[in-house]
Amino acid sequence: MAKIKKGDLVVVISGNRDDRGKQGRVLEVLTDSNRVVVEGVRRVKKHTKVSQTQRGSRTGGIETIEAPIHVSNVMLVDPETKKGTRVGYRTEEVERNGRARTVRVRVAKRSGKDV
């Protein structure tokens, strides 16, 4: 189970001086390279070649996109204190369709609340 998932609110704890301390939602998790794309963090300019589409309109130019950052440089935001926190797990017994199942739940270490 991943500690950081798509849609989580995270804070940047290290890296670029301009991005450090910023909070944003995780847009994408790249599990193969241990990186995440965070909304509004590490914005880079991408130069795209001018090309023609099927309808005849031209695309291309300079666009600003979010680049991935390493997962160790972000920390989950505690839903109660709104500060960065580590993530732990708690196992719970849940009954589904008449059968008992063991489920792992993510827990904020700072407040002990479910994430």
Swiss-Prot record:
Pfam families: ribosomal_L24
Protein's UniProt keywords contain Ribonucleoprotein: yes
Cellular component GO terms, alphabetical: ribonucleoprotein complex; ribosome
Domain of life from the UniProt record: Bacteria
Transmembrane stretches, start-end: none
GO molecular function per UniProt: rRNA binding; structural constituent of ribosome
Keyword Protease: no
GO BP: translation
InterPro entries documented for this protein: Rib_uL2_dom2, Ribosomal_uL24, Ribosomal_uL24_KOW, Translation_prot_SH3-like_sf
Swiss-Prot/TrEMBL keywords: Ribonucleoprotein, Ribosomal protein, RNA-binding, rRNA-binding
NCBIfam families: rplX_bact (TIGR01079)
Cited function: One of two assembly initiator proteins, it binds directly to the 5'-end of the 23S rRNA, where it nucleates assembly of the 50S subunit.
UniProt record similarity statement: Belongs to the universal ribosomal protein uL24 family.
Subunit structure: Part of the 50S ribosomal subunit.
PANTHER family, alphabetized: MITOCHONDRIAL RIBOSOMAL PROTEIN L24
Name of the molecule in the record: Large ribosomal subunit protein uL24
Organism: Beutenbergia cavernae (strain ATCC BAA-8 / DSM 12333 / CCUG 43141 / JCM 11478 / NBRC 16432 / NCIMB 13614 / HKI 0122)
